């Protein structure tokens, strides 16, 4: 009997330096990251939900729907946090041809140290160091041979976490440099983790995720062994001097781990698909223009648009999870379409390039592409590494990417989304509750049968039942106004519950005795 074991073969991904710039290569071929920040959160859930806890059939249906849409628009890589099983990374790759950048948060949202939860990670703490290094070593051991794995990403703008007290996005205190000492300890640990990971796996690069360029000087000093400078950047339609600064001050390739625009206008107080598409078009144009071989900075290897679908849980995190909140939680002058000095204009729950539909009985939902989806579908047809590509050619290409045309294509999706949600008025609840009560015992004063001349409660031994009908109507005339009314129609009200105070007892029949 002959037994043959075939091992899954992972791709060899490398960062290559040439005179004309820096490239990411996969099995020797140039690879530009047309990426998307992807997650799966049905309306009504938050960060505590995980798709990977569902059945394989449910996961497969969710992935096939979402990855099909992503592949259709030209996405070749998704950014996913740890927790996704290796088999689904492989499934996404083999079924849909999409790679995964695996993201370890590296203490961004707190850690459990010695049995106690610490919301703000102190990277200089030896216990933190030991825990995080152990976690990334375990991560590499589990995923390094997974087909479809593109690279590892450490953190998520952890430098901002040195200022913020929680996970919710806030304004950034850029002038506050009191955290420099904490930041240095953090970046040293990033580098130490990268060394360990690359020692165990030399076929997948390691990137860090920074918030914009804050502490770039420390990164250049402390993170010499990190392969890729990943950065979350929200500057509006242009990244400004970012490419040149990273080239001069750090010398590593630039990978935008987050960037984008929300699809809500706080001035007009309504969805604004055109503005979102405008900002993303400008961002991707600069990403391609700064790729290697085109005469500019030559250090851009791609990016991950933020994000694929709206996160209805982002504002408040645990409250109003079934409400698409229009509250703006931070301000950014780069988004000139709705910026007012002193007022917030960034709406965390509206960053999706797809709107999200209601959840069905299986826990799945449909997506409805916005204009930005169609703009990116056109933009991702460009390959900056294709022979004959020039800066002038890229400029002509993007002049042909039409936002009005994309908005027209998205109108049908918007109408379908609004129709499914019942935009202005909808039935929010319709149900019935039937409850039985049994009262019994030998050492009690409750009568065996009800006595109309002695209306005591409980009024009898044995069984009785309750009937309630619930009807709810919700009005949503505008994104910042929502009203809901619920009616409880009582049928039969039980007379024998031992608890004498309960909501339904107001519906007990009252017997009036006349003269």
Q: What residue spans do the PLM features occupy?
A:
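Active-site mouth of glycoside hydrolases
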Residues: 25, 29-229, 239, 247-249
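Gram-negative (and chloroplast) outer-membrane scaffold detector with strong preference
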Residues: 477-515
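Aromatic-rich peripheral "rim/lid" segments of glycoside hydrolase catalytic domains that contact
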Residues: 306-420
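Short glycine/proline- and aromatic-enriched beta-strand/turn motifs that initiate or cap beta-hairpins
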Residues: 410-477, 482, 486-490
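Non-catalytic scaffold segments within catalytic domains of secreted glycoside hydrolases
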Residues: 134, 207-226, 231-240, 262-304, ...
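Extracellular loop and loop/strand-boundary signature of outer-membrane beta-barrel proteins
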Residues: 124, 181-182, 450-460, 502-514
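Active-site clefts of carbohydrate-active enzymes
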Residues: 111-118, 162-172, 250-290, 300-301, ...
């Amino acid at each position: 009997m002959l037994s043959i074991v075939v091992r899954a073969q992972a791709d060899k991904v490398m960062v290559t330096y040439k005179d004309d710039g820096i490239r990411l290569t996969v099995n020797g071929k140039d690879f530009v990251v047309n990426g998307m920040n992807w997650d799966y959160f049905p309306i009504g859930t938050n960060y505590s939900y995980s798709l990977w806890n569902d059945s394989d059939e449910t996961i497969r249906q969710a992935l096939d729907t979402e990855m099909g849409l992503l592949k259709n628009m030209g996405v070749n890589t998704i950014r996913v946090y740890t927790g996704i099983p290796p088999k689904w990374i492989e499934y996404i790759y083999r079924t849909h041809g999409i790679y995964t950048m695996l993201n370890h948060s590296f203490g961004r949202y707190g850690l459990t140290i010695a049995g106690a939860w610490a919301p703000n990670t102190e990277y200089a703490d030896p216990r933190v160091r030991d825990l995080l290094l152990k976690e990334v070593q375990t991560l590499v051991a589990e995923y390094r041979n997974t087909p479809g794995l593109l690279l590892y990403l450490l953190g998520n703008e952890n430098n901002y976490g040195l200022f913020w007290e929680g996970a919710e996005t806030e304004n950034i205190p850029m002038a506050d440099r009191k955290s420099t000492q904490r930041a240095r300890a953090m970046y040293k640990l990033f580098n130490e983790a990268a060394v360990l990971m690359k020692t165990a796996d030399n076929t997948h690069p390691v990137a860090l995720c920074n918030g914009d360029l804050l502490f770039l000087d420390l990164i250049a000093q402390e993170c010499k062994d990190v392969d890729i400078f990943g950065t979350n950047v929200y500057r509006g339609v242009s990244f400004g001097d970012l490419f040149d600064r990273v080239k001069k001050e750090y010398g590593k390739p630039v990978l935008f781990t987050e960037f984008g625009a929300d699809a809500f206008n706080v001035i007009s107080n309504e969805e604004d698909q055109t503005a979102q598409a405008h900002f993303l078009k400008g961002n991707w144009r600069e990403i391609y223009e700064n790729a290697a071989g085109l005469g500019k900075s030559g250090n851009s290897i791609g990016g991950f648009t933020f994000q694929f679908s709206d996160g209805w849980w982002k504002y408040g995190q645990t409250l109003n999870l079934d409400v698409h909140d229009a509250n703006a939680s931070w301000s950014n002058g780069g988004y000139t379409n709705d910026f007012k000095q002193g007022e917030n204009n960034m709406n965390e729950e509206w960053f999706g390039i797809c709107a999200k539909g209601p959840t069905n009985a299986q826990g799945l939902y449909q997506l409805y592409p916005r204009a930005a989806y169609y703009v990116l579908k056109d933009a991702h047809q460009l390959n900056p590494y294709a022979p004959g590509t020039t800066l002038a050619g890229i400029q002509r290409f993007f002049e042909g990417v039409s936002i009005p045309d994309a908005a027209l294509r998205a109108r049908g999706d918007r109408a379908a989304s609004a129709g499914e949600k019942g935009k202005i008025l909808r039935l929010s609840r319709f149900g019935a509750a039937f409850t039985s009560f049994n009262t019994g015992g030998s050492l009690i004063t409750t009568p065996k049968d009800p006595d109309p001349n002695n209306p005591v409660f409980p009024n009898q031994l044995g069984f009785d039942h309750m009937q309630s009908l619930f009807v709810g109507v919700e009005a949503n005339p505008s994104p910042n106004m929502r009203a809901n009314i619920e009616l409880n129609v009582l049928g039969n009200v039980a007379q024998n519950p031992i608890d004498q105070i309960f909501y339904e007892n107001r519906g007990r029949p009252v017997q009036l005795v006349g003269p």
